[in-house]
C-alpha cells in the first residue's frame, strides 16, 4: 500500500460501508521482521474472497491472529484458508456465505476477551497440528518423492 491513490480507493470503499478510516491501517513495503511485527496490531485477519490467503493465513495464525474466511466454492485457491482453519481447530471461523462472514466479523470483533484468549493460545495450539509440523512435512514429502522415484524406475525398466 505504498501508492496513495490505491490507499485512498481502499479507504473510500470502507467508508462507504460505514467503517471509519481511523480503524484501518494500510501498511506499505517493509522488511520481513517489520511485516511479521505488524500482526501485533491486528485483532482479526479478514480473508479476501474469492481468492483466499495461503502463506499469509499461516503467518497470521502463527503470529496469533485468527483469520475469518468464507467457505470456498469452485477453485482450489478459494479453499486454502478454509482448509487451514479447519486443520487448525478454527472451524467456527469459516463462514458459509457473505452474510455469515459479516455477522461473524461483527460477533468476533465484539468479544475482546475471547479474542485475547485466542491470540494468546493460537501459536501453542498450532504447534501441535500436522500442518505446522515441519519435521512431519519433510518426512512425508521425502516419502512421496521416493514413491515417485520408485514408480519412475518401474515404468522405465
Regions found by a protein language model. Give the residues of each.
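Conserved active-site histidine-acidic residue motif and adjacent donor-binding/catalytic loop
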Residues: 24-37, 52
Amino acid at each position: 500500500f505504498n501508492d496513495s491513490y490505491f490507499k485512498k480507493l481502499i479507504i473510500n470503499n470502507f467508508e462507504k460501508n460505514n467503517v471509519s478510516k481511523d480503524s484501518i491501517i494500510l501498511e506499505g513495503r517493509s522488511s520481513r521482521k517489520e511485516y511479521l511485527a505488524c500482526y501485533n496490531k491486528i485483532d482479526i485477519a479478514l480473508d479476501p474472497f474469492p481468492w483466499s490467503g495461503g502463506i499469509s493465513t499461516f503467518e497470521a495464525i502463527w503470529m496469533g491472529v485468527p483469520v475469518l474466511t468464507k467457505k470456498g466454492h469452485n477453485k482450489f485457491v478459494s479453499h486454502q484458508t478454509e482448509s487451514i482453519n479447519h486443520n487448525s481447530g478454527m472451524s467456527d471461523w469459516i463462514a458459509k456465505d457473505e452474510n455469515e462472514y459479516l455477522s461473524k466479523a461483527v460477533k468476533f470483533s465484539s468479544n475482546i476477551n475471547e479474542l485475547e484468549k485466542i491470540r494468546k493460545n493460537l501459536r501453542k495450539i498450532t504447534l501441535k497440528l500436522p500442518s505446522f509440523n515441519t519435521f512431519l512435512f519433510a518426512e512425508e514429502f521425502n516419502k512421496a518423492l521416493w514413491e515417485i522415484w520408485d514408480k519412475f524406475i518401474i515404468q522405465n525398466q
